């Protein structure tokens, strides 16, 4: 997805350099307050840096929403082992495409965030694990890292601050599973990308069995403005328990899809109607995925009064997730939507856990049966039963990611499965108004 023109309703903190000439260059970054946060952080104690991040109420932007400052504080202060900073840039969630833009248009912001994290936990080496399909972004990050080394922002005795930090890119091989933090670490170490048993967690036993800070690209990019302008200023942009802005990938049946930076707590309806330019052809909102394909699906009615933040989504029994919003209008076949989602998860299951490996395969086959007009009434209950028996029974969240949207679609759009029973064609397709999903 190309970068879209900004909306006047955006609050551009992490994306403020987007659209500037040569925005990825070090010269542009330095001309717009770049690396000033690192200079400030270098004069702070590790405890002060972590406390500022805690004050900001920054929560992980990769999907889980765990408080970042708390996560950093779990890293042991004194350890005989080296500590590592790892950036999760393995962005593979359907509907999510924000991290690629942050790396493409402002790579030095990510580098500075990783540097400050290194100061906070006394780490001197970091890895950016980038999705293998992001060849262009990998080249941009490598160029930015080379610029940072050439101008003394990486390497030995950075800017005379008596702080050393080495940073490397590591390319993934296209596995969605490696977006899960422990599978990512296994892959980083050259092993098969499958999840680890936890505890211990990466903060104590992470990369190469050493203490590790592991966060998402957007999370690290939020750190420089937090340190530069203060945690309280960042916190004020959001809601009480979650500070700042969130990059939202607005996709689906809207007139103006794109990546937008919005304050946490932004109204869903305003996002769709004003930021996204409304629903295609003036149709009604039927279904809404708030944070990527792994989130429970909400109906149009459930979006009334809903805001884009962690607590609001939890009350609606969904998740903010990674911010991959998918809007579906009234001509969407929800059976087909469920099948598209399940095809992805069945393909991407690493096969390590039987409930996920077998469950996603069976769900895909059952949904395909309905899509082909061969479903039976008993199959509807079987789909729900299979999905519910996957919840909480796998080493990583992929099993839940496949089950949650399926359960919500079956429960909320039960009648559409009935419409596909006993050889009946899809009513939307038959009427010639089937929307693409």
Residue ranges, per PLM feature:
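Conserved phosphate/anionic-ligand binding catalytic regions in large, soluble enzymes, centered on
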Residues: 55-74, 117, 174-186, 190-191, ...
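Short amphipathic, charge-patterned alpha-helical segments
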Residues: 113-117, 264-282
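Cofactor-/ligand-binding subdomain signature composed of acidic, glycine-rich
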Residues: 1-52
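Hydrophobic alpha-helical positions that pack around
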Residues: 138-264, 276
